[in-house]
Structure formats: structure tokens, C-alpha cells
Amino acid sequence: MGDEKKAAIFVLVNCEIGKEREILEKLKNVPEVTEAYLLYGVYDLIIKIEGESNDQLREVMLSKVRRIEGIKSTLTMVVVEGFARKH
């Protein structure tokens, strides 16, 4: 997860039909969202949110992400441990 960030979550998002790209653009305005991708399958988007604590991540989800118009539902997964390869 990076040295400056202590907590991360991945969020699977279901969007209203046709709103996927619009929501992806709006997520660019949420600084804690460090990655976001359109998907094919059961979910429409996956996003990664990083912050200083789980409390901060919860606040970002409740006050910023979940309030974006067109988001129908989310499934949040809390990162416990991991690594990332730099290419």
C-alpha cells in the first residue's frame, strides 16, 4: 500500500444503466480514490480508496462516493495485507 497511506479498501460498484462513464469521471474528483476501472460482469466499476485510517475511509464512502448520483449499490472489501508490483 504505499508508505504514506495506512488503510485501503476496494469497492465494487453497481451503477444505473448508462451512468458508468459519468460516475468514473466524477470519481476523479475524489482525491482518496487512487484507482478506478470500468468492468464487464456483475459489477460495473471497481475502485481503490486509500487513506490514513479505516475511519477516514468510511467517511469517504459515506460522504463522497455513496452520494454520487447513479450509484445503485456498493460492496466494500477492506485490505488486510498485500503488495503491488511497480512496472
What name fits each language-model region?
Residues 1-87:
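A compositional/biophysical signature of low hydrophobicity enriched in polar/charged and small residues
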